[in-house]
Swiss-Prot record:
GO cellular component, one term: plasma membrane
Organism: Brucella melitensis biotype 1 (strain ATCC 23456 / CCUG 17765 / NCTC 10094 / 16M)
Major localization listed first in the record, in broad terms: membrane
Entry similarity comment: Belongs to the CDS family.
EC number: 2.7.7.41
Transmembrane segments: 19-39, 53-73, 76-96, 101-121, 126-146, 183-203, 248-268
Recorded metabolic or biological pathway in which this protein acts: Phospholipid metabolism; CDP-diacylglycerol biosynthesis; CDP-diacylglycerol from sn-glycerol 3-phosphate: step 3/3
Gene name of this polypeptide: cdsA
Membrane topology annotation: Multi-pass membrane protein
Name recorded for this polypeptide: Phosphatidate cytidylyltransferase
UniProt xrefs under Pfam families: CTP_transf_1
First-tier enzyme category under EC: transferase
Reactions catalysed according to its record: a 1,2-diacyl-sn-glycero-3-phosphate + CTP + H(+) = a CDP-1,2-diacyl-sn-glycerol + diphosphate
Localization: Cell inner membrane
Amino acid sequence: MSNLQTRIITAIVLGTITLWLTWVGGVGFTLFSIAIGLAMFYEWTELSATRQTAFSRLFGWAWLIVTGILLILDRGALLTIGFLVAGCAILLVTQWKSGRGWPAAGLFYAGFSALSLSLLRGDEPFGFTTIVFLFAVVWSTDIAAYFNGRALGGPKLAPRFSPNKTWSGAIGGAAAAVTGGLLVASLVAAPGGWGVPVLALLLSIVSQIGDLAESWVKRQFGAKDSGRLLPGHGGVLDRVDGLVAAAALLYLFGAIFAEPDVPSAIFFSF
């Protein structure tokens, strides 16, 4: 089987599972979000192995699992976030000499990603629409950036650590994200105005920053891929870096302007 065939099969399987669990929501999607976070943490600790100790690994795994349990038990967003931040603070203080901020950053990155995705979906119907909106924006960004960049070329976006990305791709991805976001909003009869396109544009920008940041991390440790968990695609971090960055921003918007436990209420609750 060729690498392209493997990539296609993996993408179809993962896409089907993702969309089905997004539709189901509830505990199923929460478990899916936690699984993403655990995979991210595993790859982060492997990438930054030279900055990890036995304690940082064991502590990080244990703290992340308990964070996931708090999510499943629905103990409240603020409590769960507070617990996660406390764990990161402990790692930052105890592991600074050996790991600088890498162990703490990995725990927060994985934990907050799982939390953001899970709480954005929740059990509410508008949670489903919010996640679909997020997917549409991020996937439109990725696809359009790739093809637009290849077709038009031009100046590199960040040649030092992501030599294949171009400004033409980034701009094309942002334009596609706005279009994708508006399409989802129109399907649920969202009110007009500037809110949806501006939000889609911001999410697209943050998604691309998340992609670049993950490329920078890999460069720090001389890695081409974040791992080998996804046949034909490399690692989980390689596939979700932009998604979880955008999800974190979307969650923060919802938590600030609606409420931390039901962040999607502000977006598509009409």
